[in-house]
Amino acid sequence: GACVTNALRQRGHRVLQIDPALLALHEIPHSTDVIYPMLHGTGGEDGTLQRDLDRLGIPWLGSSAEASALTFDKVVTREILAKAGLPIAPGFGLNPDSTREAIHTASLSIGYPQVVKPAAQGSSVGITIVDSEQDIDTAVAEAARWDGMVLIEKYIAGREVTVPVVNGEVFPVVEILPAARWYDYSAKYADDRTQY
């Protein structure tokens, strides 16, 4: 949020940066033109904030509350993409209370390496890249700490890119180059070696 705040200020906009942990939504000044949500994870990316802002009649930028809720749940997102005929990595959602044998059997069916993650979480929280069967139990337990459903997918090495789209206008592709193996929480928020 700080980078967006600074960029908007440099372009002459008056910006009030709000931490929802310190200021309730109903305390937002009535003179506010628009909210640009920059929150991650539960409450920020899952449609909750968007629904609350709609309820209060406060205009905001971003995807609808419904779209945010659907895409925050990675298992639901996989189902939507598959039904649309789009290619997705081999994988499956599972209840972390499944038997160890069931988890290992399903995991072996897609091969290694794998990405094990909470089905509904943001910012790469709770994600582990698993290179062998001996690490699957620990990875599932870590993901389950963050959500009641776990997603296991085949790890596909490649370039990480993001493509901003605003009001139907497609902006240039941005490649993300983390210093570590993948774009984890640290690379996103703490490691100044990440390049864009």
Task: Identify the residue ranges that each predicted region occupies.
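ATP-binding N-terminal substructure of ATP-dependent carboxylate-amine bond-forming enzymes
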Residues: 1-79, 83, 95-103
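Active-site nucleotide/adenylate-binding loops and adjacent lid/helix of ATP-dependent enzymes
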Residues: 15-18, 30, 70-159
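Glycine-rich phosphate/pyrophosphate-binding beta-alpha loops
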Residues: 41, 124, 179-182
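Phosphate-binding site of ATP-dependent enzymes
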Residues: 131-196
